Amino acid sequence: MEKFTVHTGRAVPLRYSNVDTDQIIPAVYLKRVTRTGFEDGLFAAWRTDPDFVLNKPEYKDGTILIAGPDFGTGSSREHAVWALQNYGFKAVLSSRFADIFRGNSLKGGLLTVVLPQPVIEQLWEMVEADPATEITVDLVNREVRAKDIVEPFELDDYTRWRLMEGLDDIDLTLRHVDAIAEYEKRRKPWLPVTQ
């Protein structure tokens, strides 16, 4: 997993609320067995509309998605996180996320930042007025900065540490490989091994 400390980039204003995981990536795109190649399925139904925000050239280099409230509702779908990452997004800002989506995102290295809805609206207006506006998502100091906006956000210490170290569940397990091997040596021979 890629480390996340501070990211500065352009943003994409997604003025939709209640975006569910099937809208993020429809089920027809979930047939791969790898974590890559899902960017084509991201918001696939909406991308058929030439006026959809991701089709606008001024937002093609966006790395921060500013979404409406209740982003990521619906079924638990890690592919939704992968599609956002494969497209190039490093962070998603919203006033509310579905719990399961947020958990999948943070475990997968996609920072989801909860900000007050009035701040989300300020950021939408700022980015729509000037698509070249850069936003900084600072995990070290737990704040989002853009022009005259400096907004703190909350994230528990453990999740913050994992993101800053670039550690997913497998990486955390591998940190204990010696202890696991030692445990296996002490197990009774008739018990199954855990390797």
From Swiss-Prot:
Q: Which GO terms describe its cellular component?
A: 3-isopropylmalate dehydratase complex
> Which Gene Ontology BP annotations are present?
L-leucine biosynthetic process
Under the subunit heading, UniProt states: Heterodimer of LeuC and LeuD.
Any matching Pfam family: Aconitase_C
List, in alphabetical order, the Gene Ontology terms for molecular function in this entry. 3-isopropylmalate dehydratase activity
The family note in this entry says: Belongs to the LeuD family. LeuD type 1 subfamily.
Q: Which NCBIfam families match?
A: leuD (TIGR00171), PRK01641.1 (NF002458)
Is Amino-acid biosynthesis included in the keywords of this UniProt record? yes
What name does the UniProt record give this protein?
3-isopropylmalate dehydratase small subunit
**Reaction catalysed by this enzyme:** (2R,3S)-3-isopropylmalate = (2S)-2-isopropylmalate
Q: Where is the signal peptide?
A: none
**From which organism does this entry originate?**
Thermobifida fusca (strain YX)
Q: Which domain of life is it from?
A: Bacteria
Per UniProt, the keywords (alphabetical) are: Amino-acid biosynthesis, Branched-chain amino acid biosynthesis, Leucine biosynthesis, Lyase
E.C. no = 4.2.1.33
* Described purpose of this protein according to its UniProt entry: Catalyzes the isomerization between 2-isopropylmalate and 3-isopropylmalate, via the formation of 2-isopropylmaleate.
Q: In which pathway does it act?
A: Amino-acid biosynthesis; L-leucine biosynthesis; L-leucine from 3-methyl-2-oxobutanoate: step 2/4
Q: What class of enzyme is it?
A: lyase
Coiled-coil boundaries? none
